[in-house]
């Protein structure tokens, strides 16, 4: 009888222990493995070099569930996370506190897709990049305008923008300026294949010169189909030792990027970028050219045109001419169309 009672009590005790263990497992799972994001969406927090454990917790509070944050704090205390905080951009999502903490502790941050756009100026480029990466626009500008930095990569302050090829690249948020520039140099070399480099040389250009002409072509039109024809016209002028007389270079020199008319008084503006005043290519690109414009220069159309003028129908394409007389007729038609629309 006594043995039977003991067996029942033992069985009952095992059930209680099993229940407690089961509840413990469920609680542990809830705290360690349930989604950490309080919104149910993937969120990102940015840990800076000067963040401490309190500022990290403050950032986590904004995007984390209370129970997950509690679990994160317990692990942080056990593993002395406050002494080893790693900067970066970290994901707060469907993963639980355990995996999230491991990512924070080991510096396993989420990468960022950074698109290098076909922009006009170094300032525009620096602004785009600084919105995605940790360093500031001013810090990047200081590097890009430093003679020592430009020389290190084989460029001048005027043509350093030629190192950047439009594309989307992956970076970590805490990437340094030095690492960023090395990556851009590597991607530039990858873009300039043997075939592209040979075509540039066969056309009489260095890579930087090809990028410079491509930047003018890019400014002239958004019509990619017309780009090789425009490139051919400018190459014809270069071969004949004629000034390029490219309107976009005057706009660049004056900073009047949105001008629809080029006034005669502007043509004498003293700037090495003014191709009405100075023969040859300007000292560097007037924007980061799109890939289509670069390839247009490398694969330009052979023809006899020396002049072009925007069409009076405002289609974005151009009338081409072999003689100045023909060009004058085209220019007059375009000028009248501007006046008719009240465009200054």
Over which residues does each language-model region extend?
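N-terminal Lys/Arg-rich, disordered targeting/topogenic segments
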Residues: 1-11
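Non-catalytic interaction surface on structured domains
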Residues: 3, 15-17, 42-43
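Hydrophobic, aromatic-rich alpha-helical transmembrane segments
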Residues: 10-13, 327
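A generic signature of intrinsically disordered, low-complexity regions enriched in glycine/proline
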Residues: 13-17, 33, 251
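Hydrophobic membrane-insertion alpha-helices, especially the h-region
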Residues: 16-31
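Signal peptide-directed extracytoplasmic domains
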Residues: 37-192
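Bacterial extracytoplasmic/cell-wall-associated proteins, especially those involved in peptidoglycan
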Residues: 127, 133-138, 149-344
